[in-house]
């Protein structure tokens, strides 16, 4: 039996139900200080120096100005019942993702994992923002607060809370997702598009 596609009215209703108030918050982020400035502050205070070393680690700061401070490397759909890895390499050709699609079985629980590196300076208030579209209609927007991170050689990983994939005849089909990794300064560290297909089973 052919799967029933949602009508324009049904998509509009879904969008309305998922619409969140986007009131601006009266919040002013603190002035950004470099790692060097932080390390120079109260440098004669031995206890404070040890505290900052424990907090920041022995930072090997990248001096190459051509390397972005924040590099987003991978997006992974973490799902214990998936038959294989669901991963996007974000260091390659981002345009190719528009021609591919993850398959997700309806109703399964999953999380999104973002892997990234911070190379030179502390980044405050990082956020992962995701807009979901169905047939060109935006049906959902989700903001995830990632937090503040300092430079280190190892990658960081951020996991979203557990979510349940939509289910039911009207939920099955293709979704276009526009993702963005940003921060308090509204720096666009990376923006990319990818596709998700909800099916009754993992494989037809």
From Swiss-Prot:
Q: Where is this cross-link: Glycyl lysine isopeptide (Lys-Gly) (interchain with G-Cter in SUMO1)?
A: 138, 141
N6-acetyllysine: residues carrying this PTM: 43, 105, 127, 141, 178
**Tissues showing expression:** Brain, lung, thymus, spleen, small intestine, and kidney, and weakly in heart and liver.
| GO BP: any one term | Rho protein signal transduction
* Residues joined by cross-link Glycyl lysine isopeptide (Lys-Gly) (interchain with G-Cter in SUMO2): 138, 141
Q: Which GO terms describe its molecular function?
A: GTPase activator activity; Rho GDP-dissociation inhibitor activity
N-acetylalanine found at: 2
Which is a Gene Ontology cellular component entry for this protein?
A: cytosol
Taxonomy, superkingdom: Eukaryota
Q: Where is it localised? A: Cytoplasm
Q: Give the matching InterPro entries.
A: Ig_E-set, Rho_GDI, RhoGDI_dom_sf
Spans annotated as Disordered = 1-36
Q: Name one Pfam family in it.
A: Rho_GDI
Q: Which residues form a coiled coil?
A: none
Q: Which residues carry this modification: Phosphoserine?
A: 34, 47, 101, 115
Q: What protein family is recorded?
A: Belongs to the Rho GDI family.
Job description of the protein? Controls Rho proteins homeostasis. Regulates the GDP/GTP exchange reaction of the Rho proteins by inhibiting the dissociation of GDP from them, and the subsequent binding of GTP to them. Retains Rho proteins such as CDC42, RAC1 and RHOA in an inactive cytosolic pool, regulating their stability and protecting them from degradation. Actively involved in the recycling and distribution of activated Rho GTPases in the cell, mediates extraction from membranes of both inactive and activated molecules due its exceptionally high affinity for prenylated forms.
Question: What is this protein called in UniProt?
Answer: Rho GDP-dissociation inhibitor 1
What organism does the UniProt record list as the source? Bos taurus
| Protein encoded by which gene | ARHGDIA
């Amino acid at each position: 039996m052919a799967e029933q596609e949602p009508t324009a009215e049904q998509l509009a209703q879904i969008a309305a139900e998922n619409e969140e108030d986007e009131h601006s918050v009266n919040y002013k982020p603190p002035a950004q200080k470099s790692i060097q400035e932080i390390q120079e502050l109260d440098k004669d205070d031995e206890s404070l120096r040890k505290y900052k070393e424990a907090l920041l680690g022995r930072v090997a700061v990248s001096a190459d100005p051509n390397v972005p401070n924040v590099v987003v490397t991978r997006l992974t759909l973490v799902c214990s019942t998936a038959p294989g890895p669901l991963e996007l390499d974000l260091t390659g050709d981002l345009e190719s993702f528009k021609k591919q699609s993850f398959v997700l079985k309806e109703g399964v629980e999953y999380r999104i994992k973002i892997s990234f590196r911070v190379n030179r300076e502390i980044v405050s208030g990082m956020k992962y923002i995701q807009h979901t579209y169905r047939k060109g209609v935006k049906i959902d927007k989700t903001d995830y607060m990632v937090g503040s991170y300092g430079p280190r050689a190892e990658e960081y990983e951020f996991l979203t809370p557990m979510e349940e994939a939509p289910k039911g005849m009207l939920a099955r089909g293709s979704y276009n997702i526009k993702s963005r990794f940003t921060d308090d300064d509204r720096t666009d560290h990376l923006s990319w598009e990818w596709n998700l297909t909800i099916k009754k089973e993992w494989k037809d």
